[in-house]
């Protein structure tokens, strides 16, 4: 009889998709945090529903690949992410302020303000959304925001970590606008706030694409960033520019070195950090038919700790190419000299 109820079918599907969300990103666990709080606070009768427990089991089964992989790899994924956050540490109000400013920009400033307006209206008793979905949405979103805000008091975190919660809170914005601008006489009104939000999005995309392609906005803020070795340092837009330009120039240097007998055609490449390691692998090493290896601890090279082994790992006595960018420069002598007889 339980499976004949439409509600329970949806509950089981929710368990499946929640499990897939957690399989994609650990923060998907906040879905079950929100649901658990909702059941405890407002719907305890669900504790008598077998489908609730079955839904939890379905989510847990989805996580089995993650659990098995971590068991086989000393739980390195859990420890890595655990080190990125923490409950204790020295108080840094500037980190918290940076988080708020980052959220404001990442989530579209107009949307951020509209979200605050909608939340304030709800706190004052506005009735533009039914009470049950209001409670569930708040419990699904607010815990994540509060937890990451707490982390940001003691360490630097990334503003997009709270983005899933802010996306969910946009339901309140939509409900408030729908209540304010109800359709009358088949007339269709686009609220000015929606036009403003869309305009900010379009402006940001156009400005960003133009800056990435042309660099017309000078983002070299220090004298060091104007030198040859450090040119562009601090310009985050360079992360998405110029990767396809590297291979042709490197190919000329590589061909000459092979012709002169300095390097061999089979010599592979190394890099020191997961970024730009993967970029150089995709745009340079792979097209040239050579392997790219990470050359540091797993915390620095991430997945390449395993990719290295799949490719045969670094070999003693072999020569390797090393590429580094001026905007993210790594001094070869500082990082590589202890491991190589000669750097040229």
List each language-model region with its residue ranges.
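Luminal/periplasmic acceptor-recognition loop/helix of membrane-associated glycosyltransferases
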Residues: 232-234, 238-344
């Amino acid at each position: 009889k339980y499976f004949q109820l439409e509600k329970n079918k949806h509950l089981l599907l929710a368990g499946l998709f929640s499990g897939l969300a957690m399989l994609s990103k650990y923060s998907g666990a906040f879905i079950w945090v929100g649901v658990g709080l909702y059941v405890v606070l407002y719907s305890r009768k669900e504790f008598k529903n077998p489908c609730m427990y079955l839904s939890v089991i379905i989510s847990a089964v989805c996580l089995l690949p993650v659990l098995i992989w971590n068991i086989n790899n000393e739980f390195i994924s859990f420890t890595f992410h655990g080190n990125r956050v923490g409950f204790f540490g020295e108080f840094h109000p500037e980190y918290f302020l940076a988080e708020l400013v980052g959220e404001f920009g990442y989530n579209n400033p107009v949307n951020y303000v509209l979200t605050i307006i909608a939340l304030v209206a709800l706190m004052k008793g506005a009735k533009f959304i039914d009470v049950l979905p209001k409670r569930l949405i708040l419990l699904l979103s607010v815990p994540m925001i509060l937890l990451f805000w707490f982390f940001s008091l003691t360490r630097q975190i990334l503003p997009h970590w709270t983005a899933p919660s802010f996306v969910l809170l946009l339901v309140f914005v939509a409900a408030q606008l729908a209540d304010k601008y109800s359709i009358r006489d088949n007339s269709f009104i686009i609220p000015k706030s929606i036009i403003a939000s869309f305009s900010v999005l379009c402006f940001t995309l156009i400005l960003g694409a133009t800056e990435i392609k042309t660099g017309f906005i000078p983002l070299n803020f220090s004298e060091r960033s104007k030198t040859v070795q450090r040119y562009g340092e601090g310009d985050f837009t360079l992360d998405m520019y110029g990767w396809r330009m590297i291979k042709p120039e490197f190919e000329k240097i590589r061909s000459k070195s092979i012709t002169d007998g300095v390097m061999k055609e089979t010599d592979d490449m190394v890099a020191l950090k997961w970024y730009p390691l993967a970029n150089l692998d995709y745009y340079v090493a792979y097209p040239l038919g050579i392997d790219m290896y990470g050359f540091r601890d797993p915390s620095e090279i991430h997945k390449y700790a395993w990719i290295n082994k799949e490719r045969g790992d670094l070999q003693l006595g072999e020569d390797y190419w090393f590429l580094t960018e001026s905007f993210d420069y790594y001094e070869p002598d500082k990082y590589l000299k202890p491991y190589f007889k000669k750097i040229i």
